[in-house]
Amino acid sequence: TPDGTERWVEMRIPIEEGRQYRLGEFEFEGVTVPTEEIVRAQFGLEEGDYYNESEVRDGIERLQLLYGASGYMEFLAFPDLSPRDQRVDEDGREVPTDGPAIVDVIMRAEEGDQYFVNRITFTGNRTTRDYVVRREFRLLEAGVFNSNALTTSVRRINQLGYFLPIQDDDITVDQVEGDEFQVNIE
């Protein structure tokens, strides 16, 4: 406040919890690279479990890591929820019904394309020879791009202690002009 005194405000927000939903059918659409069993294991959800949005988000993050390790750096996934206790009326609005509190989930995935490393370039290295830094790098030119290996490489280079700490956003991964499935790393 202008006079320097502290004042407190008490807020009361009424919350009315809705129904607690259980997971019904849990299907995957657009998944072709790993098996459905491997993809399903990333979520840790079984039919009949209580639906948990944070577990779904965590599962999507684990899927992004799984796909990123296989060169699919543009992978996207999003859940499509269909509660069984609602229907859509003629105006397109969801209307509650007396159905069970069960939600069916279709995980829609867009895998994108698999990328390969074209060229790895180190810039700003005036401390040591290029091969010293290159041997700490876990990606190889002409190999499949692996986002997990890139993160490990940054950590290993930082552990050398020769340079100021490198952050993940200091590394650029650019698509090679004219070759849609190749990337350069600098």
Model feature map: region roles:
Residues T1-E186:
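Periplasmic polypeptide-binding modules associated with outer-membrane biogenesis and secretion
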